[in-house]
Every structure is written in C-alpha cells, then in structure tokens.
Regions:
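Conserved small/polar residues in nucleotide/adenosyl-binding loops
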Residues: 45, 142-149
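Short coil-to-helix segment of the ABC ATPase nucleotide-binding domain corresponding to the Q-loop/switch region
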Residues: 95-103
Length: 152
C-alpha cells in the first residue's frame, strides 16, 4: 500500500485578531488528498477562521499552512486556486441585528464601548443604522449580506 501524503496541512497554526486572545490555538491538522473532513464546534470556535486562513482571506498569527506540500500562508488568495463559498447566514434568530454583530466582539472580549463604536461604524458603512434593534427575520436578503461585514 502506497503512503498517502498530506494534501492540506495546518502546522501549529495560531490566529489572533487582537494580539491577545487566540481564536485558533496550536492547530495541527493533516488532511490527505480525497479525504472528507467536517469541522464541528460552537459559534466562535474558529471553524470559519480556519477556512478563511486556508483560502487566504486571513493569515495565521503563527505556524504555517501547506497545500500539496507547498507553504501557502504568504500566497495571496487569487493565486491559491482555492474556491470558497461563504457559510449560510449564521445569524441567531433570537437576537437583534445589533446583538448578532456584537456576538463575535464579545467572544473576542472587546470592551462594550469599543464594540458599540465598531458596530455603529459597520452599520453606517452598509446604510443599516436604523436596523440595529430589528430581529434578522424581517431583514431583506440584501441586508443579510451586509451582516457579513468585517470589523477590522
């Protein structure tokens, strides 16, 4: 039987957005070509961050990511040959637009006054200032897309 080589490899990968809190810590993951892998975990556990790093939309704070044996952490997304379909709108239906936007900031332990400023700025950038207290259900598809706004 021939030895299979790792097709995707996360080698001791860390990711921090603020330089303090690690959202991905010491990830060691080896995926063989043709292998099917499912990442499971609660909201805020780093699943999407790992996929964003693999696709090149985020960079690891430490460690290296390999694709077919080649280090790719410094290669821009358009040169990696990886397609990415962003996750379905993972909004909490029991929380307002504001609370949905605040959730990842709370996970990252951003102080409330700083989080409020970031949320106000994000809502303003996508012309949704008046939607902060609404539930996501009555928000249109276009507005749902705006929820994917990045803060950094």
């Amino acid at each position: 039987m021939a030895l299979k080589k790792d097709f995707v490899k996360f080698d001791k990968v860390d990711k921090s957005y603020d330089g303090k809190v690690l959202v991905v810590k010491d990830l060691q993951l080896d995926i063989e070509e043709g292998e099917f892998v499912t990442m499971l975990g609660p909201s805020g556990s780093g699943k999407t961050t790992c996929l964003m790093m693999l696709a090149g939309f985020e960079t690891p704070t430490n460690g290296e990511i390999y694709l077919d044996g080649k280090a790719i952490s410094s290669i821009p997304p358009h040169k990696r040959g990886i397609g990415m379909v962003f996750q379905n709108y993972a909004l909490f239906p029991h929380m307002t637009v504001y609370e949905n936007l605040a959730f990842p900031l709370r996970v990252r332990k951003i102080p409330k006054d700083e989080a409020d400023k970031k949320i106000d700025k994000a809502l303003s950038m996508v012309s949704l200032q008046g939607f902060a207290s609404r539930m996501p259900g009555p928000v249109s598809y276009t507005h749902l897309r705006a929820h994917e706004t990045r803060y950094d």
